Swiss-Prot record:
GO molecular function per UniProt: GTP binding; GTPase activity; guanosine tetraphosphate binding; translation initiation factor activity
Region of interest called G4, as start-end residue ranges on this chain: 607-610
Ranges of Low complexity composition bias in the record: 116-185, 195-208, 244-280
GO annotations of cellular component type: cytosol
Top-rank taxon: Bacteria
This protein's name: Translation initiation factor IF-2
Cross-referenced PROSITE patterns: G_TR_2 (PS51722), IF2 (PS01176)
Positions of GTP binding: 507-514, 553-557, 607-610
Annotated segments matching region G3: 553-556
Region ranges (G5): 643-645
Species annotation: Bordetella bronchiseptica (strain ATCC BAA-588 / NCTC 13252 / RB50)
Region G1, residue ranges: 507-514
Gene: infB
Length: 997
């Protein structure tokens, strides 16, 4: 007897081993663990136990519903095509008949067929019995559906799946020998022909499906679904289960059967004559069994969606017609053989093939084999049997099957955790949620947002969409390469050493900041500034007798707020320069706020004390009001009177600065990768992007790979503030580097990385992130401001700004944008660093913009293009001039103000009524002048009665343009004849006055 362990048996049944062990123990099988052996008799006991347990609760009726959704396009009343969803629902009910009634009918059928048998049936099922008992156990062990099979024997069960063909069943009934009747308690003569195909299933190879299996799989696992389906299709007689005690034939006897079969083959004519009397009754029986077969197969499919192997087509039919029943026993039978051997006129050949396919191809995998001549019927888990060629399924059955399968996938909803980055496209969001992009777009449309599949969503919107779909949204930064920077910073910790202080000179414009630095550096810097004002951050380091000091000179003009903030961020000490003759000014207060916000100590330099009108005491009082208290008043801020012209007090100032530096104990690691801050950046035509860097820690070397914001590169050249090449730069040293891929933003942090590939990855990540965030914000702004300007006469002044350095661009754009009013809005279409190129002029043509160049000039080709298209190019080197001219241009775009001016007064002294003309007034001009095109007000008793225009003005008989004071005239009013003696006419004009910002 064949045996295997509980664990192996559970693997075959695809169920947990411990559950199977409990079921075996409940059936009375004494097993200790999952490693114990299971015999065929144990399996039979398990099958009997499960049938007893599930038989009482077996359902009598199965109701199947099918829903199919399709779309049609139909034109509406306006002629536009609309898509309409059409849903078709169908229901089918299968009723299980009473087993007693079926048993009676089967007994009568067996009696009729026994008389028709001339030759004993072939005893093929015996060796397959033990093998088939195991699959029966497997099907019964599945608690998904109680087993319907109550038939006694598997060989008998197999033919029941082919009730439609009557003739072939009789044709195969003849060659069966009688041992089948001895082996089974209740043999059924009609279904016997299927025994040979069922045995062929147990062969090692199943070529009908092009599936290669081992002998064990073929004997135990593969026949299982077929047998289960067949047992369900048999009549429900309460006969005993297939006997495990039946002798198991050796492989030799199993292979010898096909050779012996041809000797007992009967002629086709005899078979038909013997079957003729029972034909009417059998037709009814076959029709009933066909319905039962379909219901049982549907139950099998619904309970166990496993891949099913088809039983091969019965060989004896082909043999009866061609003289050969089987191929040699060594070769497994194939389903294609009967088709080749059968003649076109052979009775029942085609029908047998069809019924065999119907009974043995219940599978959910519709794409597992190539289509044959007769397409097998396929049943899906959520639909009915889709007929093959010529069946109910039709050509669209495969598409319908795919639609049904897709519907089922949608029904199985699984809530997931969706990580939503800062920006994500609609397509990516749909992919993360495993839904179609169209569903996401539909949901966004419900939320009031019209999007496309590639549109970028911001994080908040994407999280709302995820929650609408029932998933859990988590705001996250996945795969952020910047995490690498934190790891690098943690690893590269070095010993800190003393460093030079970084001192920022701040103050109001024209208070002498640069002149003070000029004296300290002994170099003429201020004379080279345009307009005598600083428009860049200058970085210098000075060697004094007490050490090195690095100075940053910031602009004082109000436009350079961001630059001053950057200067305070990068600095250790702030020198606040205040003119002794001018006192505290707005930018002085702003510098104090920047210093306090950064927690930076202040040193006040009261400049211009050499002037006669200097008043240092007034400056002290004003600074005390700003909470900057001098040391002599009990505060902590040193006050040093200096003169940038004579040099008085400069040494005291430096001494105070170095004293503050000693108190701060400034330290930084030197032997470490450099980190710094981008002070300024520009695009040089010959050298490319150039950045001024203040090294804050570590040592920057020539050839280092650096990352600055969204740009990266290798340091190709390094210059100090005097333009000399240097190889290294330590902490607190300002340098100018070349070799970056693009111009970084001023204020970006710079750091040295060991891996250029990683630097490129982080830079590209930052670029994409910046672009996505910018686009998402623009989209949100568009949606919010869509109706803001609707109906308003808002005018827009478009500008393209090109500057020499990043800081100037930032300051200029900020200043120009602040000029916007409710009526005229300044729109900076494009702002960048570098000269004015042809592409800038093309952009100006497209957007009708004015091009502003700040310390830059246009290329020759750009100049010609601008002249040809009438584009206005403006060059400036002082920020005041640029702001003032843009303000003047905006004033010209403002709607003029209309004012009313009274120019004369007329009194009515005579009134004449003339036909075809109307009422004519004879008047005297009392004051001013009356003009023909003027407007008038009719005054009666000093109350305004009417306002309008003069229709005509005459003096005597002549039309005149105007009549001055002291002269009489005749006039008519346009659209008004109500004139009386004593009325007065007030003559006025409306003048337009240009407005200014």
């Amino acid at each position: 007897m064949s045996s295997n362990t509980v664990a192996q048996f559970a693997t075959e049944l695809k169920m947990p081993a411990n559950v199977l062990l409990e079921q075996l123990r409940a059936a009375g099988v004494d097993l200790k663990s999952v490693d114990d052996a299971v015999t065929d008799s144990d399996k039979a006991k398990l099958l009997e136990s499960l049938r007893r347990a599930h038989g009482a609760t077996e359902g009598k009726k199965i109701t199947l519903t099918r829903r199919q959704t399709s779309e049609i396009r139909q034109a509406d009343a306006t002629g536009r095509s609309r898509t309409i969803q059409v849903e078709v629902r169908k229901k089918r009910v299968f009723v299980k008949r009473d087993p007693a009634e079926l048993a009676a009918e089967q007994a009568a059928a067996r009696a009729e067929e026994a008389a028709a048998e001339a030759v004993p049936a072939e005893a093929a099922p015996a060796p397959a019995e033990p093998v088939r008992a195991e699959p029966a156990v497997e099907t019964a062990a599945k608690p998904v559906e109680p087993p319907v099979a109550e038939a006694p024997a598997e060989p008998v069960a197999a033919p029941a799946a082919e009730p439609q063909s009557e003739q072939p069943a009789q044709a195969e009934a003849q060659p069966e020998p009688t041992p089948a009747a001895q082996a089974e308690p209740e043999p059924q003569p009609e279904p016997q022909p299927e025994a040979a195909p069922a045995q062929a299933v147990a062969e090692p190879v199943e070529p009908a499906k092009n599936v290669s299996v081992t002998e064990t799989e073929a004997e135990q696992a593969r026949p299982e679904p077929v047998v289960h389906a067949q047992t369900e299709l048999t009549s429900k007689t309460p006969a005993p289960v297939a006997q495990p005690s039946a002798p198991a034939e050796s492989p030799k006897s199993a292979k010898a059967e096909p050779a012996a079969a041809p000797k007992t083959t009967a002629k086709p004519g005899e078979i038909r004559r013997a079957a003729a009397p029972a034909a009417p009754d059998r037709a009814r029986e076959e029709a009933r069994r066909a319905a039962e077969a379909e219901a049982a197969a549907l139950r099998e499919m619904l309970s166990r969606p496993r891949k099913v192997l088809r039983a091969p087509e019965p060989e004896p039919q082909a043999g009866a017609l061609s003289g050969t029943l089987h191929k040699p026993a060594g070769k497994p039978a194939t389903t294609a053989a009967p088709k080749k051997d059968a003649k076109p006129g052979a009775p029942g050949a085609k029908k047998t093939i069809k019924t065999a396919e119907v009974s043995s191809t219940w599978s959910d995998d519709s794409a597992r084999k190539k289509p044959a001549d007769n397409k097998p019927a396929v049943t899906t888990r959520d639909g009915w049997r889709a007929g093959g060629k010529g069946g109910r399924g039709g050509r669209n059955s495969r598409n319908q099957h795919q639609d049904r399968r897709h519907e089922q996938v949608q029904q199985e909803f699984i809530a997931r955790e969706i990580h939503v980055p800062e920006t994500i496209s609609v397509a990516d969001l749909a992919h993360k949620m495993s839904v179609k992009a169209a569903e996401v777009i539909k949901q966004l449309m419900k939320l009031g947002q019209m999007v496309t599949i590639n549109q970028v969503l911001d994080q908040e919107t994407a999280m709302i969409v995820v929650q609408e779909f029932g998933h859990m949204a988590i705001a996250a930064k996945l795969d952020d390469p910047e995490a690498f920077l934190d790891e690098t910073a943690a690893v590269t910790e070095a010993e800190a050493e003393p460093r030079a202080p970084v001192v920022t000179v701040m103050g109001h414009v024209d208070h002498g900041k640069t002149s003070l630095l000029d004296y300290i550096r002994r170099a003429k810097v201020a004379s080279g500034e345009a307009g005598g004002i600083t428009q860049h951050i200058g970085a210098y380091h000075v060697e004094t007798g007490r050490g090195v000091v690095t100075f940053l000179d910031t602009p004082g003009h109000e436009a350079f707020t961001a630059m001053r903030a950057r200067g305070a961020k990068a600095t250790d000490i702030v020198i606040l320069v205040v003119a002794a003759d001018d006192g505290v000014m707005p930018q002085t207060r702003e510098a104090i706020h920047h210093a306090k916000a950064g927690g930076v100590p202040l040193v006040v330099a009261v400049n211009k004390i050499d002037k006669p009108e200097a008043n240092p005491e007034r400056v002290k009082q004003e600074l005390v009001a700003e909470e900057v208290v001098p040391e002599e008043y009990g505060g902590d801020v040193p006050f040093v009177p200096v003169s940038a012209k004579t040099g008085a007090g400069i040494d005291d100032l430096l001494e105070n600065v170095l004293l503050q530096a000693e108190i701060l104990e400034l330290k930084a690691p030197i032997e470490a990768p450099a980190k710094g801050l981008v002070i300024e950046a520009r695009l040089d035509k010959g050298r490319g992007p150039v950045a001024t860097i203040l090294v804050q820690s570590g040592t920057l070397k020539r050839g280092d790979v650096v990352l600055a914001g969204a740009s990266f590169g290798r340091v190709r050249a390094m210059l100090d503030e005097n333009g000399k090449q240097i190889q290294t730069a330590g902490p607190s040293i300002p340098v100018e580097i070349q070799g970056l891929t693009e111009v970084p933003a001023a204020g970006d942090e710079l750091m040295v990385l060991s891996d250029e590939r990683k630097a490129r990855e982080i830079a590209l990540f930052r670029q994409g992130k910046f672009r996505d965030v910018k686009l998402a914000r623009q989209q949100a702004a568009k949606l919010e401001s869509m109706f803001d300007n609707l109906g308003e006469g808002t005018q827009t002044l478009a500008l393209i700004v090109k500057t020499d350095v990043q800081g100037s661009q930032e300051a200029l754009v900020s200043s120009l944008t602040k000029l916007s009013t409710d009526e005229v809005r300044v729109q900076v279409v494009h702002a960048a660093v570098g000269g004015i190129s042809e592409s800038d002029v093309n952009l100006a043509i497209a957007s009708n913009a004015v091009v502003i160049g700040f310390n830059v000039r246009a290329e020759q080709s750009a100049k010609k293009l601008a002249e040809t298209n009438g584009i206005d190019l403006r060059y400036y080197n002082i920020i005041y001039d640029a702001v003032d001219e843009v303000k003047a241009a905006m004033s010209g775009m403002l709607a003029p103000e209309k004012r009313e001016e009274v120019i004369g007064l007329v009194e009515v002294r005579e009134v004449y009524t003339i036909s075809r003309i109307g009422t004519v007034a004879g008047c005297m001009v009392l004051d001013g002048v009356v003009r023909r095109d003027s407007q008038v007000r009719l005054l009666r008793n000093n109350v305004v009665q009417w306002t309008g225009h003069l229709d005509s003005l005459r003096r005597f008989k002549d039309d005149v343009k105007e009549v001055k004071s002291g002269f009489d005239c005749g006039l008519t009013l346009r659209g008004n004849n109500d004139l009386q003696l004593g009325d007065q006419l007030e003559v006025f004009e409306i003048k337009e006055i240009a407005r200014t910002l």
